[in-house]
């Protein structure tokens, strides 16, 4: 610092002009502070996995492709792992730091002793009851078979809650067939092949088949019947959250900015769909943008209603777990982010 001041003194005629000297000294100190801050925000590596590649996952891809993770000081390794159970195992085992899975998967794992917690969400799943075109009404589903991914999947729990509201009793009026298939697009293929009669799917699934000229019977809507299922929640181990709050806070900021970038810019959204899902049809991109990007929550707090229903459903299927007295979410970081005004800033 002394040499810098001496150099400036010689250039300012013996120090007679103090205002430029003070100004330049202030700029120098600001530069030092900026460099120090940029070093501080280099938070290191974060390993993130998602259980299924769908249009709802776009915000993670957008954050990756547009260097939003780097913007907040993170070097992110983003990987796809097929299936919620396997993805959860990688988190619990320590190979992955953060995962994107259904809330039901996280709650079930926590109920069985896994030290995991939900810290954010991407919103609700817009489940529809999809049937073969020959089935025109709910009454025609009686005696038929509905395909599910597995007996612990979010579609299974949604159906058990939804069917009685539609006048159908599981096990009596309809039966379930475990397909082992997570993708609703693939399950609908089983419907069209006549191997099952109906399944749950999304608005995206309906649009995809209709654009191919294949009609489906949409018999009911889950949300319209008061059934709320998260499309995907952000989950971390409690110990990792405790030891790495700065990393997770930076991740959440990148995630939130990715969501808002998707909302505002359909071209950015479409670019990641082309890269990760091989979707080229702009008509489908337009539908998926409306169904997913525009549906991202403005503040991604875990959905209390979805979690409440998931707990009730899991307890009904696994009464030994007794989940009611447990805490499955931690919103401390999101509350910090909101208190700092980040939501307001990013939405401008």
Q: What are the residue ranges of the model-derived segments?
A:
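Pocket-lining segment of extracytoplasmic ligand-binding domains
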Residues: 103-105, 176-177, 183-277
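Secondary-structure end/capping motifs
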Residues: 242-323
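Bacterial N-terminal signal peptides
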Residues: 22-32
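Conserved C-terminal helix/tail region of periplasmic/extracytoplasmic solute-binding proteins
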Residues: 311-348
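Bacterial N-terminal signal peptides that target proteins for export
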Residues: 11-24
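Sec/Tat signal peptide C-region and signal peptidase I cleavage site
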Residues: 34-38
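Short, glycine-/small- and polar/acidic-enriched structural segments
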Residues: 39-183, 187-193, 197-203, 218-222, ...
């Amino acid at each position: 610092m002394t040499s810098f001041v001496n150099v400036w003194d010689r250039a300012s005629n013996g120090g007679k002009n103090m205002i430029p000297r003070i100004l330049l000294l202030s700029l120098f100190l600001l530069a030092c502070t900026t460099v120090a801050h940029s070093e501080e925000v280099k938070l290191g590596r974060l390993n993130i996995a998602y259980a299924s590649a769908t249009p709802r996952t776009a915000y993670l891809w957008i954050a990756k492709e547009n260097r939003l993770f780097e913007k907040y000081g993170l070097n992110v390794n983003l990987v796809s792992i097929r299936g919620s159970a396997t993805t959860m195992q990688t988190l619990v085992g320590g190979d992955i730091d953060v995962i994107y899975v259904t809330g039901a998967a996280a709650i079930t794992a926590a109920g069985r002793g896994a030290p995991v917690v939900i810290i954010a969400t991407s919103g609700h799943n817009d489940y529809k009851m999809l049937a073969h075109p020959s089935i025109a009404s709910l009454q025609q589903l009686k005696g038929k078979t509905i395909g599910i991914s597995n007996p612990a999947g979010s579609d299974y729990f949604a159906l058990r809650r939804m069917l009685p509201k539609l006048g159908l009793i599981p096990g009596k009026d309809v039966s379930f067939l475990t397909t082992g298939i997570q993708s609703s697009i693939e399950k609908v293929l089983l419907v069209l092949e006549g191997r099952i009669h109906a399944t749950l799917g999304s608005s995206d699934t309906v649009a995809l088949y209709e654009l191919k000229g294949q009609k489906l019977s949409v018999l009911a809507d889950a949300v319209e019947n008061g059934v709320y299922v998260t499309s995907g929640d952000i989950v971390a181990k409690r110990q990792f959250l405790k030891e790495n709050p700065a990393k997770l806070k930076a991740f959440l900021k990148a995630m939130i900015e990715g969501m808002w970038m998707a909302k505002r810019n359909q071209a950015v959204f479409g670019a990641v769909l082309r890269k990760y899902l091989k979707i080229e049809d702009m008509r489908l991109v337009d539908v998926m943008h409306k169904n997913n990007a525009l549906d991202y929550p403005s503040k991604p707090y875990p959905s209390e209603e979805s979690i409440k229903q998931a707990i009730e459903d899991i307890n009904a299927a696994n009464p030994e777990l007794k989940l009611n007295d447990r805490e499955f979410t931690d919103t401390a970081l999101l509350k910090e982010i909101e208190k700092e005004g980040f939501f307001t800033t990013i939405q401008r």
